[in-house]
């Protein structure tokens, strides 16, 4: 909608509160969840290590349910400059593809090859081969299941082979927060924006080693935080999968690279933008200070401007409400005249 001009701003996000008996039972019946028994068996222990329950791309036994929420504000480039918005990144493309026919509803399928390869091809077209080969990283779905670690890593490596990419860093935020279901890709996006800001790729710290069936021919899976300030990361590929066979891959560009692109399009207007950006950041800092002091200035209007039901005027043609200039006009057309 933003690219077509239908919208100038959009709030995008999700929230999920999945820690309920019904969801636990459903995912358990699918054999998708990690269990205390499974963790103990992996570790040769009688006590489960819950801090390391989610183990993407390591020896694992299922994912860990979690709850979360993530939201981002998207706007077109001209509006962002006009408002002096603090730009944390840009999303030029998102590709979605279903698996189609397959043997199991919960098994990984072929659709992710399409979404991921399309995303890499788009990134090359937008930013060039050098950025994709040397200054990009992958935020994997990394659900902490044996099937995911083998199949997703194979996708990454086969696409890397096709595009001539080596030593491609792969991380997985579910090692830190578990699987928040609807907002899981939002977790990945927020972590990617953090990498752009601090130039650190978070390590998959819940595993001691990468599992033997994980394909690592052209990829690397850091187990500790990786400092990439010298290399510089300007591109993240966020990969997401869903039970039922849907897949999505997003291209996310760093604010540094976005700044270069905006300068080429808007030229001298960037000087005015930078002045507005300073004001925006100062207001954000001031708000943070007030919030720390619980000075939230909450707008509370309970009981104000309540519509008086008795003042509603009704007729056969429509109705009017106090405080609204336009009436509600009834649609009297019959779309089923042939059946009436």
What are these regions (language model features)?
Residues 1, 73-76, 116-119, 156, ...:
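Buried hydrophobic packing segments
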Residues 6-61, 94-109, 140-149, 166-218:
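Acyl-CoA/ACP chain-elongation machinery
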Residues 10-14, 74, 92, 237-240:
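Short beta-strand segments
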Residues 38-131, 136-137, 253-322:
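Condensing-enzyme catalytic core mediating Claisen C-C bond formation in acyl metabolism
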Residues 65-69, 112, 152, 182-188, ...:
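Catalytic-loop motifs flanking and including active-site residues across diverse enzymes
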Residues 119, 123-127, 131-139, 149-176:
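A beta-strand-loop signature enriched in Asp, Gly, Thr, and Trp
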Residues 197-244, 249, 258, 304-313:
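Internal helix-turn-beta structural module
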Residues 318-340:
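Extended non-globular C-terminal regions
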């Amino acid at each position: 909608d933003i690219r077509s001009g239908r919208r100038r701003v959009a709030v995008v996000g999700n929230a999920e509160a999945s820690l309920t008996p019904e969801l636990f039972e459903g995912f358990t019946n699918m054999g998708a969840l990690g269990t205390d028994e499974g963790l103990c068996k992996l570790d040769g222990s009688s006590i489960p290590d819950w801090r390391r329950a989610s183990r993407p791309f390591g020896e694992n036994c299922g994912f860990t349910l979690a709850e979360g929420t993530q939201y981002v504000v998207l706007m077109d480039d001209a509006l962002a400059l006009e408002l002096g918005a603090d730009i944390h990144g840009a999303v030029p493309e998102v590709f979605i593809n279903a698996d189609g026919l397959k043997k199991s509803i919960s098994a990984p399928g072929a659709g992710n090859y399409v979404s991921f390869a399309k995303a890499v091809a788009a990134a090359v077209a937008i930013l060039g081969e050098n950025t994709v080969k040397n200054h990009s990283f992958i935020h994997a779905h990394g659900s902490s299941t044996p099937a995911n670690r083998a199949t997703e890593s194979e996708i990454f490596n086969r696409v890397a082979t096709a595009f001539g990419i080596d030593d491609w860093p792969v991380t997985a935020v579910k090692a830190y927060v578990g699987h928040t279901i609807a907002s899981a890709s939002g977790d990945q996006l927020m972590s990617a924006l953090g990498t752009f800001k601090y130039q650190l790729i978070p390590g998959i710290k819940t595993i001691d080693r990468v599992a033997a069936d994980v394909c690592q021919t052209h990829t690397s899976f850091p187990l500790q935080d990786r400092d990439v300030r010298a290399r510089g990361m300007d591109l993240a590929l966020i990969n997401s999968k869903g039970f039922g066979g849907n897949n999505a891959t997003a291209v996310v560009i760093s604010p540094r690279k976005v700044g270069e692109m905006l300068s080429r399009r808007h030229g001298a207007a960037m000087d005015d933008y930078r002045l507005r950006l300073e004001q925006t950041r100062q207001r954000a800092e001031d708000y943070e200070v007030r919030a720390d002091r619980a000075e939230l200035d909450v707008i509370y209007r309970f009981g104000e401007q309540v519509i008086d039901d008795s003042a509603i005027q009704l007729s056969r043609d429509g109705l009017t409400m106090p405080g609204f200039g336009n009436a509600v006009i009834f649609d009297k057309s019959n779309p089923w005249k042939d059946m009436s």
